[in-house]
Amino acid sequence: VLSSKDKANIKTAFGKIGGHAADYGAEALERMFLGFPTTKTYFPHFDLSHGSAQVKAHGKKVGDALTKAADHLDDLPSALSALSDLHAHKLRVDPVNFKLLSHCLLVTVAAHHPGDFTPAVDASLDKFLANVSTVLTSKYR
């Protein structure tokens, strides 16, 4: 459960992320592909090289989805329902991969905003990403 302080930290962080969400999403995907190469199996049709248009486009989708989620902290299931259906029924992404991408997203945000990435912000964003992951995997049954 996100506390009021967590929600404030998330809103503040996404305010700073601002128009960089797509770039950060792509960077986090690149980090994930490099650090956890087994995740590449879900993207066999992608050019996974640094700066590829496909990774950038998917990074934009990730960034847009997280921005939408950050704007709907009190109703993540509704905000992410279509995305949850897609990942559960069509893409069938192993749920562990959401945790890996979440880690890479945290590293990316920390790298770009080191002065703002306090332990409290880290904890709040980690809880937020865990909640998003839970929603995305909720329809796997």
UniProtKB/Swiss-Prot annotation:
The record's GO molecular-function terms, alphabetically, read: haptoglobin binding; heme binding; iron ion binding; organic acid binding; oxygen binding; oxygen carrier activity; peroxidase activity
Question: Which InterPro entries does this entry report, sorted A to Z?
Answer: Globin (IPR000971), Globin-like_sf (IPR009050), Globin/Proto (IPR012292), Hemoglobin_a-typ (IPR002338), Hemoglobin_oxygen_transport (IPR050056), Hemoglobin_pi (IPR002339)
Which positions does the record annotate as the modified residue N6-succinyllysine? 7, 11, 16, 40
Q: Which residues bind heme b?
A: 87
Keyword presence, Iron-sulfur: no
Q: Where is the Globin domain?
A: 1-141
Phosphotyrosine PTM sites in chain numbering:
24
Q: What does this protein do?
A: Involved in oxygen transport from the lung to the various peripheral tissues.
Spell out the subunit comment. Heterotetramer of two alpha chains and two beta chains.
Q: What is this protein called?
A: Hemoglobin subunit alpha
